[in-house]
């Protein structure tokens, strides 16, 4: 079993790459700028007895994106069965401040690159095997890391949100178009890891403001990944691992109701 995880040098990408290795996968660890971190992940995976390669690619440059799946196949020694589109740009803009640059950066990284990778991945996935009932079992799975905010829209992070909305649509339409060979699912994380520009107080407040009054931990994300890996009959679905953040209902009109 072989997997490609984009943005796997740090944070949730790293956690998912290591989880896959513990599940018996050889892993291609993609990175853009985090070379040392990606190489460290490769060492951790090889220490677990699995094969791993670090692959550099700028997801804003399509010619580099197009090379990632072939390089992963070559580096790991065979076809991939899992693709995790994890790498993402998350920069603030609004309908008033968005520029062509902010639009293109988010669309290329967060939507176009996953689309191109999904095309290449699907083209090399082996034919599905038949189970004991004579029914096909998909040989490949794509997991898109989206965001709970696609179910709870706000006017903030406009270009980012629109790209993730597109990725959510891609998840469902690709699930239709690539069946029965490939399943396509998604995870919508909420507050899981503290952002680089986020204060400790802000992070604690954000986690506590969810319906469950807690955020998610990396183990919650990998548990959702594990569910999708094990669930041959599940495709086109998103699990929000967010403490119920997308269900938030305590808005001023409700709080002021007497």
Regions found by a protein language model. Name each.
Residues 1-28:
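Canonical Rossmann dinucleotide-binding motif of NAD(H)/NADP(H)-dependent dehydrogenases/reductases
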Residues 20, 79, 168, 178-192, ...:
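Conserved Rossmann-fold SDR core element
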Residues 23-40:
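Conserved glycine-rich Rossmann-like NAD(P)H-binding loop of the short-chain dehydrogenase/reductase
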Residues 86-91, 244:
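Conserved NAD(P)H cofactor-binding loop of Rossmann-fold oxidoreductase domains
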Residues 94-95, 99-107, 206:
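Substrate-binding pocket helix/loop in short-chain dehydrogenase/reductase
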Residues 129-179, 191-192, 245:
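Catalytic loop of short-chain dehydrogenase/reductase
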Residues 217-241, 246-247:
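C-terminal substrate-recognition "lid" of short-chain dehydrogenase/reductases
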